[in-house]
């Protein structure tokens, strides 16, 4: 017969999370083994409205199958209206959090993403390792719209990359040791070969091993805004070419 899936827990914000009105706890969620990550993109951090935060929960923290909060993550350089936590992903002991509205220099809404590791700074400290941005990023790209991680490779979507406000969209691939140990350097920019304005390529991304899939919800195929998804392979077209 079919497997039966029953609800085990309601993961509402626990008291220790200090969630407030309109924090948007659960904006994005991800899980790996017994560790889960929840984004709260509209969380006010200090005096910064809508800076955003993310919570790490462990299955047996506070008791068997309790799913207790073990860490609150915020951007080390966070500011207002960055929406940190709008996208989250986890793979083993690594977490990545998107902040698509982050202002970089004078470029508003250029966007960024932050990588954390479980034991960075000490056992279970979940310390920030690196803030990553697109090398060719520009205002209104919304880099960090989506994130995914598999082992030592990260993929980040930027839905408006490629033009002022209405770009085709792009996704960026980063490798943990590109440019040095734990440097998380950019190794590839992925774009749709048939992309057009407002396709929103990069609105969703996923990676598993050597394969990446990118969503483009507004791509015109046989009808306007029908949507499409694009699959890329690491070694298609050459080693680490991501064709």
Feature map (PLM): residue ranges:
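Conserved beta-strand/short-helix segments
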Residues: 1-243
């Amino acid at each position: 017969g079919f497997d039966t899936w029953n609800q085990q827990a309601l993961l509402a914000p626990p008291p220790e999370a200090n969630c407030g009105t309109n924090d948007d706890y659960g904006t994005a969620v991800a899980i790996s083994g017994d560790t889960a990550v929840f984004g709260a993109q509209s969380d006010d951090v200090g005096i910064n409205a809508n800076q955003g935060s993310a919570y790490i929960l462990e299955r047996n923290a506070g008791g068997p199958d309790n799913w207790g909060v073990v860490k609150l993550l915020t951007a080390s350089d966070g500011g207002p209206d960055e929406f940190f936590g709008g996208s989250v992903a986890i793979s083993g002991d690594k977490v990545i959090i998107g902040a698509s509205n982050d202002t970089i220099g004078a470029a508003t809404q250029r966007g960024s993403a932050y990588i954390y590791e479980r034991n960075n700074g000490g056992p279970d400290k979940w310390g920030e390792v690196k803030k990553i941005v697109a090398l060719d990023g520009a205002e209104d790209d919304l880099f960090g719209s989506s994130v995914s991680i598999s082992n030592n490779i990260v993929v980040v979507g930027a839905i408006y990359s490629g033009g002022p406000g209405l770009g085709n969209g792009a996704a960026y691939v980063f490798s943990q040791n590109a440019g040095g140990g734990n440097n998380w350097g950019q190794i590839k920019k992925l774009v749709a070969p048939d992309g057009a304005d407002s396709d929103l390529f990069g609105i969703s991304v996923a990676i598993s091993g050597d394969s990446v899939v990118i969503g483009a919800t507004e791509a015109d195929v046989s009808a306007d805004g029908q949507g499409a998804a694009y699959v890329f392979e690491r070694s298609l077209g050459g080693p680490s070419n991501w064709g």
